[in-house]
């Protein structure tokens, strides 16, 4: 346990310093103009200097230039778009695929209205919300893993 010395506010010398705005931040030094005019610009300029020095001294590797005439066989999106990409890839009708994607946020919006009867915060006492969460998480993981696989084994994940 740390022992900290608290200031003696009954000391008239300290009270006079505090009234003038003198002293350390712990004793009530005002943020204006000390912090805002002196400390913040130093931190901001230091951050800019560090960023610029890293960009100049250690630039990120760009890799080989892209060839617009040679595209890969299958273009994959970023990893966080895998479940959405898998929905579009599996559903045969594109309009139906877009409607399936739009159904996800609509379904998430309806969950609080379904659970409005239940006032408990414990997830074990909210079976509908817990079941929907587990089902949605499992479905998103399943679709995400399937999107990284070829189309013929994407639904079964190569298990069957």
From Swiss-Prot:
Gene3D superfamilies: plastocyanin oxidoreductase, Single helix bin. Belongs to the cytochrome b family. PetD subfamily. This is Cytochrome b6-f complex subunit 4. Disulfide bonds: none annotated. CDD domains: cytochrome_b_C (cd00290). The 4 large subunits of the cytochrome b6-f complex are cytochrome b6, subunit IV (17 kDa polypeptide, petD), cytochrome f and the Rieske protein, while the 4 small subunits are petG, petL, petM and petN. The complex functions as a dimer. InterPro entries: Cyt_b/b6_C (IPR005798), Cyt_b/b6_C_sf (IPR036150), Cyt_b6/f_cplx_suIV (IPR005870), Cytochrome_b_C_euk/bac (IPR048260). The chain crosses the membrane at residues 36-56, 95-115, 131-151.
